[in-house]
UniProtKB/Swiss-Prot annotation:
GO terms for cellular component: cytoplasm. Belongs to the class-V pyridoxal-phosphate-dependent aminotransferase family. SerC subfamily. The gene is serC. Pyridoxal 5'-phosphate binds at G76, R77, W102, T153, D174, Q197, N239, T240. This is Phosphoserine aminotransferase. It comes from Shigella boydii serotype 4 (strain Sb227).
């Protein structure tokens, strides 16, 4: 079978080594004669999987001991509701920074539970889309927390600054598309959440990192399935968890540790992004409209100078083994998602194709 590189924004490409191990263990896991999908989540075998996954995840991000790691359901959209329901306490407002599609989606959901103080951080710099630096973000005095999205998959916008708003500001962040791709200082956040389907594992699992002093404040109307304290008290097994996604995510964590951890991923991700943006910037045939300071290293949207060639580009790239390059309907054009599992070889194959496509059609 020819080599396929999957540039999907999520569910995204998984490491080949992880898929191979899962394939080998699919019907006989741990010598039990059954699949990991068939064993009890409360049995000692799966409990070991869960405990190792949490330990490895903590190691990868250096999660401080006063933070809890929860393995939840509901994806990022579930957390759009869970954050206000768990963190508001007796306050009625929260600060939300709008820098793109997913931040706006979080704001829309939050309006069901509080009065968001929305700061629009989107700006245009020299005709390119950008985000105001954190020092210019206007926060309110009475907010329960401040929420933002460090990486906008659709817009191709990243906010790589580390929050520094003082110890009294609880920062909540949607890291779904950038978790584990670069080192972060977890202690600067109150809540970090991430859907698994981009840099962690299969869809269906959501990881929440929450500072323990924020537990026990859930709104009385908060559904139990979204209550951080309930999940913490039950070892993330309040109900039957997505066991296969948990198991496979655990394999990804071990793969990351075996390949240099988050620091090494950071270096490789920088190389991949520089290679792809380099081809775009050195061409009049392709363009990206995000200011360099805010370009995402995970999701690279780009347009062809002649949109009439879009269909042909997608057909020929697919035939070349470069899949899922169609841009989101909101932005159009193309989008290459190059998460941790995408090897440098895959980005090189894409850029080689782009150069050749331009030679033939430019």
């Amino acid at each position: 079978m020819a080599q396929i590189f999957n540039f999907s924004s999520g569910p995204a490409m998984l490491p080949a080594e992880v898929l191979k191990q899962a394939q080998q263990e699919l019907r006989d896991w741990n010598g039990l004669g059954t699949s990991v999908m068939e064993v009890s989540h409360r049995g000692k075998e799966f409990i070991q999987v869960a405990e190792e996954a949490e330990k490895d995840f903590r190691d990868l991000l250096n999660v401080p001991s006063n933070y809890k790691v929860l393995f939840c359901h509901g994806g990022g959209r579930g957390q759009f509701a869970a954050v206000p329901l768990n963190i508001l306490g007796d306050k009625t407002t929260a600060d939300y920074v709008d820098a793109g599609y997913w931040a706006a989606s979080a704001i829309k959901e939050a309006k069901k539970y509080c009065t968001p103080n929305v700061f629009d951080a989107k700006v245009t710099v020299d005709g390119l889309r950008a985000v105001k630096p954190m020092r210019e973000w206007q926060l309110s005095d009475n907010a329960a927390y401040m929420h933002y999205c460090p990486n906008e998959t659709i817009d191709g916008i990243a906010i790589d600054e580390t929050p520094d708003f003082g110890k009294d500001v609880v920062v909540a962040a949607d890291f779904s598309s950038t978790i584990l791709s670069r080192p972060i200082d977890v202690s600067r956040y109150g809540v970090i959440y991430a859907g698994a389907q981009k840099n962690i594992g299969p869809a269906g699992l959501t990881i929440v990192i929450v500072r323990e002093d924020l537990l026990g404040k859930a709104n009385i109307a908060c559904p139990s399935i979204l209550d951080y304290s309930i999940f913490n008290d039950n070892g993330s097994m309040f109900n039957t968890p997505p066991t296969f996604a948990w198991y496979l995510s655990g394999l990804v964590f071990k793969w990351l540790k075996a390949n240099g951890g988050v620091a090494e991923m950071d270096k490789i991700n920088q190389q991949k992004a520089e290679l792809l943006y380099g081809v775009i910037d050195n061409s009049d045939f392709y363009r990206n409209d995000v200011a360099k300071a805010n370009r995402s290293r995970m999701n690279v949207p780009f347009q062809l100078a002649d949109s009439a060639l879009d269909k042909l580009f997608l057909e020929e790239s697919f035939a070349a083994g470069l899949h899922a390059l169609k841009g989101h309907r909101v932005v159009g054009g193309m989008r290459a998602s190059i998460y941790n599992a995408m090897p440098l070889e895959g980005v090189k194959a894409l850029t080689d194709f782009m150069v050749e496509f331009e030679r033939r059609h430019g």
